[in-house]
Amino acid sequence: MASGRDPREARPGEVEIWDLSREPWDKWLRDMLQDLNQEARLHFGRELLFQVWNYCQEEGERHGTPMMERAYKYYRLVQKALFVHFRCGCRRRQPFEPYEERRDGQGGGRANRVPPGLE
């Protein structure tokens, strides 16, 4: 070749989740978290979701992870949990209501920030 350049398309590197070209990342993530949490609440209950959210927040604070990455970690964990739950065969017909949620109406969770969709 005269130019010395390879005419083939360059092999992409590792795709960064933050580089995806769609609506602003924070708006997309917030909308997805709300939808995911509404579905997850029917199968796992607020207490468990608050515990997962708190875990992601505490791990992120410990490692200095930005808030958006913490929220995305929570999203991935809950999404995987729902996948496994459905894969094992969900037999639930009613929303999840553990004793604590019926007793005081709130469930657990002492998070500084509430996961989107669980307000």
Curated annotation (Swiss-Prot):
Protein name as annotated: Protein Vpx
Source domain of life: Viruses
Family, similarity comment: Belongs to the lentivirus VPX protein family.
Function: Plays a role in nuclear translocation of the viral pre-integration complex (PIC), thus is required for the virus to infect non-dividing cells. Targets specific host proteins for degradation by the 26S proteasome. Acts by associating with the cellular CUL4A-DDB1 E3 ligase complex through direct interaction with host VPRPB/DCAF-1. This change in the E3 ligase substrate specificity results in the degradation of host SAMHD1. In turn, SAMHD1 depletion allows viral replication in host myeloid cells by preventing SAMHD1-mediated hydrolysis of intracellular dNTPs necessary for reverse transcription.
Organism encoding this protein: Simian immunodeficiency virus agm.vervet (isolate AGM TYO-1)
Additional information: This is an African green monkey isolate.
Biological processes per GO annotation: symbiont-mediated suppression of host innate immune response; viral life cycle
Subunit architecture: Interacts with the P6 region of unprocessed GAG. Interacts with host VPRBP/DCAF1, leading to change substrate specificity of the CUL4A-DDB1 E3 ligase complex.
One Pfam family it belongs to: VPR
Segments of this protein annotated with the region Disordered: 98-119
Subcellular location: Virion; Host nucleus
GO cellular component, one term: host cell nucleus
Record's keyword terms, sorted: Host nucleus, Host-virus interaction, Inhibition of host innate immune response by virus, Viral immunoevasion, Virion
